Each structure stands twice: as structure tokens, then as C-alpha cells.
Regions:
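Short glycine-rich anion-binding loops that position phosphate/pyrophosphate groups of nucleotides
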Residues: 10-12, 90-93
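Active-site histidine-acidic residue metal-binding/catalytic motifs
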Residues: 1-68, 101-103
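A general structural motif
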Residues: 1, 80-82
């Protein structure tokens, strides 16, 4: 069975990772956005019959090393040719109350 591993970027306790304050005083928080997107993707993929694993279900930030350990465990269990890992991030480019000039998006992959 093909397995899709979903990683939601950052946790509630990760400093930064948010927008400048909006007019109403709230901020866009990357951890909330990423978890909402991952939950929606997981629901749709499961409905299509895929085996889906959310790598980081916790609200707190999980270290990169622990994320890699969890991913590698699933890859050993299901086989490298049967797994796809997607990490969802928003890459907010705010600095306190000002936006920085970053633009665009990125996708990272490995050989194979």
C-alpha cells in the first residue's frame, strides 16, 4: 500500500513563525495554518484509499532529528518506493510588526 507521510511545520511553542499583527491585533500563525492544511490533505487522501501518517500530531514543536527518525521508521516499514513525505510550511516573512521582502514558494525533494 502506498503511504503518504505528512509533516506540519513548526509547533505552537516555536518562536517567530507568524505574520505581523493585523489591524484587529491578531497574527497569522504558521503552526495553525500547517495543521489545518495537513488535516484537510489527510482526510482527502484517506478517502482516496491512501495510507496516511501524520508525522507530527503534537501541538508542540518536534525536533528535526525526531521528525527524521519517525519518517525513517515508516520508510523501513512500508518501503522507500512506497512512501512520499510532504512537509507543509507557510514560510511567513514577518519581522515583529513589518513584512520582509521574501516572495514565492519552494519545493524540496531527494533523488529517486
Amino acid at each position: 500500500m502506498f503511504t503518504i507521510l505528512l509533516d506540519n511545520g513548526h509547533g505552537v511553542n516555536t518562536s517567530g513563525k507568524c505574520s505581523p499583527k493585523k489591524a484587529d491585533g491578531t497574527r497569522f500563525r504558521e503552526y495553525k495554518f500547517a495543521r489545518t492544511i495537513v488535516t484537510n490533505i489527510a482526510t482527502k487522501l484517506k478517502a482516496l484509499g491512501y495510507n496516511v501518517i501524520i508525522v507530527t500530531p503534537e501541538q508542540e514543536d518536534i525536533s528535526l532529528g525526531e521528525r527524521v527518525r519517525r519518517i525513517n521508521k515508516s520508510v523501513r516499514q512500508y518501503g522507500a518506493g512506497n512512501c512520499l513525505m510532504i512537509s507543509v510550511h507557510a514560510n511567513a516573512a514577518g519581522n515583529n510588526d513589518k513584512w520582509m521582502s521574501a516572495r514565492g514558494w519552494s519545493a524540496w525533494t531527494t533523488r529517486g
